[in-house]
Amino acid sequence: MIFLINIKLSLIIINQNLHGKMIVYKNLNIKKKHKGSVVAIGNFDGLHVGHKKVLKEAKLKAKKNNLKFGLITFEPAPTMFFNKSIKNHRINSLEQKIYFLKKMKLDFLIIINFNKNFSNLSAEEFIRKILFNKLRTKYIYVSRNFKFGKKRLGDIITLKNFEKKYFYKMVIISPHKKKKKIVSSSLIRKIIRQGQLNKVKKLLGRTWSIEGVVVKGDQRGRKIGFPTCNIKLNSYTVPKLGVYSVWVQIDNLKKRGIANIGYRPTFSGKSLLLEVNIFGIKKNLYKKILNISFIKFIRAEKKFKNINQLKDQIKKDIVKAKNNV
C-alpha cells in the first residue's frame, strides 16, 4: 500500500481556535489588548535557537512592563516573493511555525501577506502604518542584520532614527553563536542539504521535521514488499539525497521508519520524492497528516542493477534505521 503525501502549505489561512491562547492575525485588525505591546519582527524560518533568544528577551521585557508580547512575520518569505526561482527554501511550513510559537506562549502572532503592495512600502511607511498606527508598539525587538522596507533600505539605524517620532524603543539582540558560527536560517538550510542532522538538531533545538497529507500513490513499493509514503517536497529545503532513519507521527501514534530522498534511479524516476516506509503500519493512511522527523543519514542514493538488489539493500537499511532511531 503506497501513499503520496502532497505537502500543502497553509498560506495565511489560520484557524485561530487550533492555537490555544495565542491569537493569530491574518490581517491588521488588531485587538485593543494587543496594542502598545512588545513586538519582535522577522521571518523566523525554522524558529532556531537564535530566534528563540530574541523571543525570550522580548517576552521578558513584556513581563517586566506588564505588556503583551507578539511577533510580526511574513508569508511568503520576502526571499521567496522576490525570487520565484527559489522552490525549496523552507525549513518549516507556516503551520509548523505557528505550532512552535504557540509552545513559546506568545500572546499574538501577526502574519503579514507579503505581496507587491506591501513590498512597496518604504521603511518609514512600515513604521508609521503598521508599528505605530495599527499597533502603537512600545518596544521593537530585531536582530542586528534586520532589513525592511522597499528595496530593503530600512535597517536598525532607520528604526533608531524614528524612535522619538513614533514613540517606541528599539532593542537589538546580538547574534547567537554555536562554535563561533552565527546561527541563521541560511546556515541551517546549508547543513540540511549536507545531511548533517545532528548539527541541525543542535541549531534548531529540536529534530528537523516536515508535514504532509497522505494521498494515493502508484503502489510500486507495495509490489516489492515495502509499502511507502511518497512525499513531494514542494517548498521544503531538500536534504542530502539518500536514505535516512526517521520517526513518523500519525495522530497520537509515533512509529519508526526509513526514508529515501531522491529520484528513484532504479526505476528511472524523473521527479524528486521523499519515500517513507513506516514500520508496523499496514492500515490505510489516506488523507492522514503525517509529521516526519529526520534522525540520521544512513547512505547515499544508489541505482541498483535489479529489484532483488534493491530489496536486499532496503532490508539492510531497515536494520540500520532501527539501530539508529
Where are the model-predicted features located?
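N-terminal amphipathic/basic-hydrophobic helices that include classical n-h-c signal peptides
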Residues: M1-K21
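Short acidic-hydrophobic, aromatic-tinged amphipathic segments that line or gate anion-handling sites
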Residues: I23-N29
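Residue-level signal for inorganic ion chemistry
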Residues: H48, L101, I140, V200, ...
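N-terminal Rossmann-like or analogous alpha/beta NTP/dinucleotide-binding catalytic cores
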Residues: M80-R144, F148-Y166
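Glycine-rich, Lys/Arg-enriched anion-binding loops that position phosphate/diphosphate groups
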Residues: E163-N260
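Phosphate/ribose-recognition catalytic cores of enzymes acting on nucleotide-derived substrates
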Residues: V215-V325
